[in-house]
Amino acid sequence: MNLTPAQERVYGFVRDYIQKNGYSPSYEEIRQNLGFRSLNAVFKHLKQLEQRGYVQSLWKNKKRALELLPLHTGAVSIPFLGVVAAGTPIEAVEIPESVEVPESFLANGNNFALRVKGDSMIEEGIREGDILIVARQSRAENGQTVVALVQGEATVKKFYQRGEEIELRPANSRMQPIHARADAVEVVGTVVGLLRNYRRRSLGVV
């Protein structure tokens, strides 16, 4: 079963923290590093991960009691197509590269990956340098996070359509949405997953 982007961020942080330190992060460390406003959000996502068989809590009411459970799905290589803006739209650069992702992260059909540039989606937990996993599709529902082309330039935003007008809304209260006619916006795909490398290993794209 696919995880939500927020669940993937929590799982990825816990996994990388355990690999680096040999023990699990505290709930407060998860909250601070992933930008959640409250511990309740952390508890909610961890409970969902536990229900789906990704983690388990060894001791109740302990700060560092998380254990990763073995995953029964392998890694899948998908195309890595360059950089997408989480700010002002920029052109996505196609390069001969690929990235391996957990099979459980993928949607049905054609998937690809893009690196985020900018911080307009920061309030959704999407940071500069993150790798987005995108399911290629030409339609989206209101409220979905999409990769879209606006006059040929790629951007990642929240999608809303009212009649013939499309609003691409940032998740950053300091930034303004993009408004355009429907015929000027091409939805490339919807964001179905996110990878974050805390060691900031380069994939060859600046």
UniProtKB/Swiss-Prot annotation:
InterPro entries: LexA, LexA-like, LexA/Signal_pep-like_sf, LexA_DNA-bd_dom, LexA_repressor, Peptidase_S24_LexA, Peptidase_S24_S26A/B/C, WH-like_DNA-bd_sf. It holds the Pfam family LexA_DNA_bind. GO terms for molecular function: DNA binding; serine-type endopeptidase activity. GO terms for biological process: DNA repair; DNA replication; negative regulation of DNA-templated transcription; proteolysis; SOS response. The record marks A86, G87 as: Cleavage. It catalyses: Hydrolysis of Ala-|-Gly bond in repressor LexA. Keywords: Autocatalytic cleavage, DNA damage, DNA repair, DNA replication, DNA-binding, Hydrolase, Repressor, SOS response, Transcription, Transcription regulation. The active site is at S120 (for autocatalytic cleavage activity), K157 (for autocatalytic cleavage activity). Its EC number is 3.4.21.88. Residues 27-47 bind DNA. It comes from the Bacteria. NCBIfam families: lexA. Homodimer. Belongs to the peptidase S24 family. Represses a number of genes involved in the response to DNA damage (SOS response), including recA and lexA. In the presence of single-stranded DNA, RecA interacts with LexA causing an autocatalytic cleavage which disrupts the DNA-binding part of LexA, leading to derepression of the SOS regulon and eventually DNA repair. This is LexA repressor. It comes from Syntrophobacter fumaroxidans (strain DSM 10017 / MPOB). The lineage of its organism: Bacteria, Pseudomonadati, Thermodesulfobacteriota, Syntrophobacteria, Syntrophobacterales.
